[in-house]
Amino acid sequence: MSLEVFEKLEAKVQQAIDTITLLQMEIEELKEKNNSLSQEVQNAQHQREELERENNHLKEQQNGWQERLQALLGRMEEV
């Protein structure tokens, strides 16, 4: 009878070890996925910052052209 109990205990211990091993593998996969997603977020942030700088530059150019156009229109009205 004690051999039966020992075998059941051994089976439960083995099952626990298998479960722990699977969970460790899953944790590693999730860590890799998390690192990958973190890198994607960082890349997206850099792209956003670059686009914001470009947008500001284009707005400045647009304002410059609008000022020139207003000046030309003002000269045309004077004539």
UniProtKB/Swiss-Prot annotation:
- A UniProt-annotated Pfam family: ZapB
Superkingdom field = Bacteria
Bias-annotated ranges (Polar residues): 35-45
The record's InterPro entries line, in alphabetical order, gives: Cell_div_ZapB
Residue numbers of N6-acetyllysine PTMs:
K8
Q: Which GO terms describe its cellular component?
A: cytoplasm
Q: Where in or outside the cell?
A: Cytoplasm
Q: Ranges of Basic and acidic residues compositional bias?
A: 46-60
Region span, Disordered: 34-65
Which residues does UniProt call coiled coil? 3-79
Main localisation? cytoplasm
Q: Could you provide one GO biological process annotation from this protein's UniProt record?
A: FtsZ-dependent cytokinesis
Keywords on record:
Acetylation, Cell cycle, Cell division, Coiled coil, Cytoplasm, Septation
Q: How does it assemble?
A: Homodimer. The ends of the coiled-coil dimer bind to each other, forming polymers. Interacts with FtsZ.
Q: What does this protein do?
A: Non-essential, abundant cell division factor that is required for proper Z-ring formation. It is recruited early to the divisome by direct interaction with FtsZ, stimulating Z-ring assembly and thereby promoting cell division earlier in the cell cycle. Its recruitment to the Z-ring requires functional FtsA or ZipA.
Q: Which family does it belong to?
A: Belongs to the ZapB family.
- The molecule here is called Cell division protein ZapB
Q: Can you name the source organism?
A: Shigella boydii serotype 18 (strain CDC 3083-94 / BS512)
- Gene, per the UniProt record: zapB
